[in-house]
């Protein structure tokens, strides 16, 4: 299955093209994807900037879909606020962004993934206002797509960036994704687009032969 948008793959591909000299160090790279043309460009500090379409959640909270909070192990009094994330042209419905009252609550969530896979919609993004150097924190679950919890999710940050930039009144933020592996993504809101900035390291090289 080819996914419409994959931040990991785009970042890694750009990194390899720069590292091997197949793309000029100071030039932009264009990728043709199911989400249209996406660009990547290396910044002065070595981080790679991805230019992706924004997927903003609806600003007003909605009633959670049946079974969502129970599958996440969240009681009604936990203070969760659910926002629908429209996904144009998607056949499996919207995603859900669930804002939680604290990073501690976010870390403690232990989903029932089989139950979560039965909830209407594509995927679930959990988020809370960040601590320390991080403006916001998140986790991402997509058991219907075979990904119980993703390590770091570019597509989720296409929704998190406009959500938190609007909430905090700033155009550039730093987010931490609190999966077991964890990761840091810098984001910039640019109208209908989002800039995602990350780092990449080559850990394995191979050779394909016919």
Segments from the language model and where they lie:
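Active-site proximal loop and beta-alpha junction motif in alpha/beta enzyme cores
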Residues: 1-210
């Amino acid at each position: 299955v080819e996914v419409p948008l994959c931040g990991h793959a785009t970042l890694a591909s750009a990194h390899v093209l720069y590292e091997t000299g197949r793309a000029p160090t100071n030039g932009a790279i264009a990728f043709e994807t199911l989400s249209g043309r996406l660009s990547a460009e290396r910044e002065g500090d070595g981080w790679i900037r991805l230019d992706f379409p924004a997927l903003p959640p609806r600003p007003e909270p909605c009633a959670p879909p049946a079974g969502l909070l129970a599958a996440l192990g969240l009681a009604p009094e936990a203070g969760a606020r659910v926002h629908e994330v429209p996904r144009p042209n998607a056949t499996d419905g919207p995603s859900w962004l669930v804002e939680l009252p604290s990073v501690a609550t976010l870390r403690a969530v232990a989903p029932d993934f089989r139950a979560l896979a039965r909830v209407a919609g594509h995927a679930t993004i959990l988020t809370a206002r960040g601590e320390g150097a991080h403006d916001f924190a998140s986790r991402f679950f997509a058991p219907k797509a075979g990904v119980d919890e993703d390590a770091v999710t570019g597509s989720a940050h296409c929704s998190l960036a406009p959500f938190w930039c609007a909430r905090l009144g700033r155009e550039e933020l730093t987010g931490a994704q609190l999966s077991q592996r964890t990761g840091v993504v810098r984001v910039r809101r640019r109208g209908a687009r989002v800039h995602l900035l990350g780092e990449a390291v080559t850990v394995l090289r191979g050779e394909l032969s016919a």
